[in-house]
C-alpha cells in the first residue's frame, strides 16, 4: 500500500509541472488572440569541418557558434516557433541554416606589427648606471636572548610551587651589514 502511494506521488510530481504549463499557455492558434501563428519547419543542416579544426591563434573575423554533433548528411526536423505576420504560403519550404558563422559586419583588419617596439642592438652609455659595491663586510653584533630557568626549592615551610626566574645571556650573531 505504501509503495503504491509513493509511486503515485512520484508520477504526480513529474507530471504536474507539464500540466501547469499547458494550463498557463493555452493553444495560441486561436484566431481571437492577436492573429499570431506559429509554424514548425524542417531546417537544412550544413556542416563545416574547418570550424572544428581552426587554429585558435588566427584572427577572428566572425562570431562562431558551436557545432551540433550529428550526422552532416541528413536533414533534421527542428521545431522552430516562427512568428508569422504573413500567410504561411509565402514562407519557403526549406530554409538553409548554415552551421558556420555568418559575417556580422565589416571584418576588422589585422594590425601590422610595425607598431610594436622592437629592441635594437645599439650600445648605450653605461655612465648612467652608477657602479656599486655588492660585497658588504660581515659584522658580528651581539643579540641578547632570554632563557627561562626553573628552580625547584625543597623547602618544607614554603609552598611546593616551582619558582621560575629568567636569565639573560649574550650570544654573538654574525650578519652582513648593509
From Swiss-Prot:
Top-level taxon of the source organism: Eukaryota
Subcellular location: Secreted
Phosphothreonine PTM positions: 120, 145, 165
Family that this chain belongs to: Belongs to the kappa-casein family.
Keyword check for Secreted: yes
PANTHER family: KAPPA CASEIN (PTHR11470), KAPPA-CASEIN (PTHR11470:SF2)
Name of protein: Kappa-casein
A Pfam family hit: Casein_kappa
Function: Kappa-casein stabilizes micelle formation, preventing casein precipitation in milk.
Protein species of origin: Rattus norvegicus
Signal peptide: 1-21
Keyword field: Glycoprotein, Milk protein, Phosphoprotein, Secreted, Signal
Amino acid at each position: 500500500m505504501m509503495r503504491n502511494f509513493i509511486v503515485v506521488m512520484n508520477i504526480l510530481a513529474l507530471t504536474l509541472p507539464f500540466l501547469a504549463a499547458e494550463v498557463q499557455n493555452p493553444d495560441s492558434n486561436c484566431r481571437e488572440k492577436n492573429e499570431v501563428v506559429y509554424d514548425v519547419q524542417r531546417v537544412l543542416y550544413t556542416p563545416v569541418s574547418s570550424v572544428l579544426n581552426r587554429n585558435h591563434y588566427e584572427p577572428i573575423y566572425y562570431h562562431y557558434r558551436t557545432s551540433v554533433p550529428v550526422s552532416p548528411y541528413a536533414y533534421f526536423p527542428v521545431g522552430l516557433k516562427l512568428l508569422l505576420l504573413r500567410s504561411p504560403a509565402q514562407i519557403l519550404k526549406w530554409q538553409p541554416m548554415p552551421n558556420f558563422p555568418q559575417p556580422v559586419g565589416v571584418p576588422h583588419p589585422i594590425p601590422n606589427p610595425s607598431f610594436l617596439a622592437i629592441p635594437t642592438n645599439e650600445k648605450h652609455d653605461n655612465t648612467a648606471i652608477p657602479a656599486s659595491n655588492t660585497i658588504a663586510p660581515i659584522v658580528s653584533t651581539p643579540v641578547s636572548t632570554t632563557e627561562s630557568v626553573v628552580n625547584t626549592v625543597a623547602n618544607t615551610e614554603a609552598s611546593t610551587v616551582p619558582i621560575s626566574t629568567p636569565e639573560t645571556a649574550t650570544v654573538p650573531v654574525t650578519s652582513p651589514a648593509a
